Amino acid sequence: MIIDVATYTDGRREEVDDLAAALERCRRGERGFVWLGVHDPTAEEFEGVARVLHLHRLAVEEAVQGHQRPKVERFDDVTFAVLKALAYYEDRSAVETGEVMVFTAEHFVVTVRRGQLGDLGPVREALQADAHRLRLGPRAVLHAVMAHVVGGYRAVDEALEQDVEEMEEQVFSPARTSDAARIYSLKREVLEVRRAAAPLVAPVRALVERGEAPPGDGSAHELEHRVERGLAHG
C-alpha cells in the first residue's frame, strides 16, 4: 500500500494526486523529484508504479517478492538498493529482520518496506526539516535511508555485545553454568548482523566514489565499522 507520495522542489514539499503528472513536471522543469513510499506492495499495486517510472522488470520482481540479499545495483539510470532492517529482542535473544528497498533516479525515489521493521517515517520527517539536504535530490534520500538502517545495526550490535559479555562472565565465574544453546544462539544472531551489513560495504563505497553520495556522507565508513564489530564478536 502507498504510505506517502509528494514532490520536493528546492526543499519544499507538495502533495501529489497524479504520479505520472508529478514526475513529468519534475522532468520538464529539470528540478525537483517525486518521493513515493510503499509498504508490502502487491504485484498489482506495484505494476502501475513500475510502468510510470519505467523500473526494470527484475528489480520490480525482487521488490514485490522480497527475501533478497542486501545489495546495491544499477539498472540503466536507476540505482536499486536492498537493505536488511534489524531489531534485537533481548527476552528471546533473537534478531528479527525486515527489508527496505530503494529505487533512485534523477527525478524520483521509491522506498519499499517489507515487514514490520524499517519504518522510514522518521527519515522523511528529518529530511523535510532540512531543506539543504533535500535540495541534493534522491541521492540524499538514499543515503539517509542507509544511515537510518545502519543505525539499527548499531543498536543491535551493542545489545548483542552486552549479552556476549554477560555470557562470558558466567562462563568464567566460579559458579559458571554451561548454556551451550544460548551461546550458539548468540553466535547465530551475530552472523545475522554480518550478513546484513557485509554485502553493502563495497557497493556503498562505489556510490561514494562515483559521486552519488551527498558530500560528507558517512554511510560507507559506518557500514565498515558495523562489519568489523560483528567480526570481532565472531
Please report, for each region that a protein language model flagged, where it lies by residue.
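Peripheral, non-transmembrane regulatory/ligand-interaction domains of membrane transport proteins
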Residues: 1-222, 226, 230-233
